[in-house]
């Protein structure tokens, strides 16, 4: 593994946020969301704490839930199936191609 490449400016910003008492939903997060929305030419953007949270929110936005099946590769991280169960849907595991780990239609 590699050590993170952080500038002093980045370290100072993290210290500023930690000292503010707001870690996840404070003014810096709101500023970041507004800048991301502006850059993406959209009205709103939402920061989430993890890829797992993002994937679950995506399923919910798409209306995936009870009675739905979601196809996922068998070779994956556990959260892939967990979030599908969490929204009430059923994960359907499919084989992966040897060497590439892409889903294989067989």
Where are these regions (language model features)?
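N-terminal "arm"/small-domain region of PLP-dependent enzymes with the aminotransferase-like
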Residues: 1-23, 27
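Short N-terminal helix/helix-N-cap motif within the alpha/beta-hydrolase-1
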Residues: 56, 74-75
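ATP-dependent adenylate-forming carboxylate-activation enzymes
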Residues: 95-106
């Amino acid at each position: 593994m590699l050590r993170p490449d952080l500038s002093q400016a980045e370290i100072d910003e993290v210290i500023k946020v930690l000292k503010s008492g707001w870690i996840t939903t404070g003014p810096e997060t709101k500023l970041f969301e507004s800048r991301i929305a502006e850059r993406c030419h959209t009205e709103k953007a939402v920061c989430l704490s993890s890829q797992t949270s993002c994937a679950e929110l995506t399923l919910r936005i798409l209306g995936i839930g009870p009675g739905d099946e979601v196809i996922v590769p068998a070779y994956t991280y556990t959260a892939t199936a967990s979030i599908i169960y969490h929204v009430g849907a059923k994960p359907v595991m499919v084989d992966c191609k040897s060497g590439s780990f892409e889903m294989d239609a067989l």
